[in-house]
A protein has these predicted regions:
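Short, polar N-cap/turn motifs at the start of nucleic acid-interacting alpha helices
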Residues: 131-138, 204-205, 225-245, 252, ...
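N-terminal DNA-binding recognition helix of tyrosine site-specific recombinases/integrases
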Residues: 5-12, 19, 38-72, 122
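Catalytic-site neighborhood detector that most strongly recognizes the C-terminal catalytic loop/helix
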Residues: 85, 146-150, 187, 235-260
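C-terminal secondary-structure termini that scaffold catalytic or DNA-interacting sites
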Residues: 171-176, 261-270
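C-terminal catalytic core of Y-nucleophile DNA break-rejoin enzymes
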Residues: 80, 147-166, 175-196
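Short basic/aromatic active-site micro-motif
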Residues: 24, 48, 106-107, 184-188, ...
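C-terminal catalytic core of tyrosine-transesterase DNA break-rejoin enzymes
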Residues: 112, 116, 122-123, 196, ...
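Basic, Lys/Arg- and aromatic-enriched nucleic-acid-binding interface segment
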Residues: 43, 47-49, 62, 66-121, ...
């Protein structure tokens, strides 16, 4: 896709089908970034395309094809993205809802399981019996590797996810240790049914499976005083910087909540 954007840009801006690397300078980069931003790319998407182009220059320098890097004087940075999450009130609304349709109940249960464990979709889908292990505290933990990064993950199971595992322990899929423990549908179907669940529960946020992971990081752990380093390990983040995004979201909410409180108490005088 990056190549397609670049090819169209060259045609529209320069009436050419190609450019040699030595011809590309900071003026070219500035025009290309502006083109991306004015053709449907937000800041971070445009930045990722620019970073892809930068990789070409880095490799060309390593191979001795060019000696200068136009990106050395061109600043490109991703902007932090706020992660959506459910409040405890919203989560409890979903947990307490009774559904007449069994498939919605299954999807809700698996979503809630992820809210209380932080498991990503692929990790919840492949979770097996041998990955539930009793640890030093006498409680069962999830001991696995993140499918996305291969990072070791150890997550203590709270009462809610334990109850969900108990509920589905007699399903056909979980009857053998090599089979998944939970009846997880395709990601596309899960998200489609979650949207339906959100509508039925009056949740105005875009309910997707990944929102559960964000909810674990914010509402379940950080908001309740779990240290960021611990949360980072349970999420399987490779750097603490990734986890800090969630902390920033919580700090921003605290600031807004206190500003609202200050406004309400503004008339009280000493």
């Amino acid at each position: 896709r990056n190549y397609a954007h670049l090819k169209t840009f060259l045609t529209e801006e320069y009436r050419r089908s190609d450019f040699s690397l030595p011809e590309i300078n900071t003026a070219f980069l500035s025009k290309y970034e502006f083109y991306l931003r004015t053709h449907g790319c937000n800041h971070n998407t445009a930045t990722k395309y620019m970073q892809g182009l930068h990789t070409i220059f880095i490799n060309a320098i390593k191979d001795g094809l060019i000696v200068t890097d136009p990106f050395s004087s061109y600043d490109i940075k991703l902007e932090p993205v706020d992660r959506g999450y459910l409040t405890m009130s919203e989560l409890q609304t979903i947990m307490n809802r009774k559904f007449s349709c069994e498939r919605l109940t299954h999807v809700r249960d698996i979503f809630v399981f992820s809210c209380f464990t932080g498991l990503a979709y692929i990790d919840a889908k492949k979770l097996k019996k041998e990955e539930i292990q009793e640890r030093f505290d006498g409680r069962p933990w999830i001991v696995t590797k993140r499918g996305k990064t291969g990072t070791d993950v150890k997550i203590p199971l709270l009462d809610v996810p334990l109850a969900i595992l108990e509920k589905y322990k007699h399903t056909a899929e979980s009857s053998k240790s090599s089979k998944p423990l939970l009846p997880v549908l395709s990601n596309q179907k899960m998200n489609a049914y979650l949207k339906e669940i959100g509508d039925l529960c009056g949740i105005e946020k875009n309910l997707t499976f990944h929102l559960a992971r964000h909810t674990f990081a914010t509402t379940i752990t950080l908001t309740n005083g779990v240290p960021m380093e611990t949360v980072s390990k349970m999420l399987g983040h490779t750097t603490l910087k990734t986890t800090q995004i969630y902390a920033r979201v919580i700090n921003e909410k605290t600031r807004n909540d206190m500003a609202a409180l200050a406004s309400k108490l503004g008339e009280i005088k000493m």
